[in-house]
């Protein structure tokens, strides 16, 4: 019913001037086009539900006059430019609203967000309680409910573990996202062992992604190898140096903030398609003495992930690592190790037969025991790959006898019980 002139500009007739609310639900309007809503001089409320937005929504795209917004039905996890946060050295926070809000209706995925929404809620709690700000969130059934910072942990064993080790986060049997961790729990490592018998890790994200948790290690194991546990997607924080996930089905492990990550071990994950370590400013970037040490050196183990397509390392000209172990990756398409110049232990099991296996271009051969720079193991299928033959020729068959440290050390052992290492030294001798 709106009228536009020949240049496509809105004519400010009575209809346009009197428009205070606008339903744009299901229109798939891009967020870049939202700035054009400022042409309605009295528009304050807009329905943007079911528009396919996500994983982030940027409030800076909204005209300042829009104070009421419905984002339900979208898959949004991050709410950029809703608030700004300044954290003092003592941990105190100064939160500032970046966009005036009188109504905020959120999708069910908003329950995952702590960084933006919980701080907005805490900053504006008095207005929300008084009804000056109408803040709601849909539940799993799509029904709007009053927004709350309380979150459930469905698995009773996980609940027990978290209440025992991170009690400061809880309000009764629910995690309260508005609570802070005390000093003793703030840096505590997260270790859920097989003996803890967890089969559903729903709720763990509220600790892993909590900005007030500064633990360095995440080690999560399901109840057993035959019991694959479920887990929601997680975004790992900047304090994390080690991630271990075994027998857990999770679609996405976001490591974009994990700049201190040094070690990753993912085993038996039927859902993961990508593992990206490229954000780390630590992995593979220490000196040879550090990286050649089994305790402090960089490590990557990816075993039994049947639909994993891509692994990425930091994009540096020279990487050094203690361990790289990839086995039973039936769908692997992309993993370039050519910038790895030193690795103490290299294990290559069965991989996608069409995968172009690019080996490390080794130039540094350091060993704490003074014997071999790189201990190498592979499966028989991998042994017969052309690139493996070339790697062995360059680093084992044609070595300089005057080398003080042998380039390749022999081992036939692989880590993954569903893969068998071959006696590659014997197979080489048979080829002579």
State what each model feature region is.
Residues 1-41, 75-77, 81-227, 233, ...:
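N-terminal capping/linker segments that flank leucine-rich repeat
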Residues 20-24, 44-48, 67-71, 102-106, ...:
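Conserved hydrophobic beta-strand positions in leucine-rich repeat
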Residues 27, 51, 74, 107-110, ...:
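Conserved "Asn-ladder"/turn position within leucine-rich repeats
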Residues 30, 54-55, 77, 112, ...:
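Leucine-rich repeat
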Residues 42, 64-65, 238-241, 257-262, ...:
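Short "repeat-start/strand-capping" segments in structured domains, especially the N-termini
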Residues 48, 59, 71, 78, ...:
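Extracellular beta-strand solenoids
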Residues 222-269, 279:
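Right-handed parallel beta-helix
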Residues 229, 276-299, 307, 320-323, ...:
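Extracellular beta-strand/beta-solenoid scaffold signature
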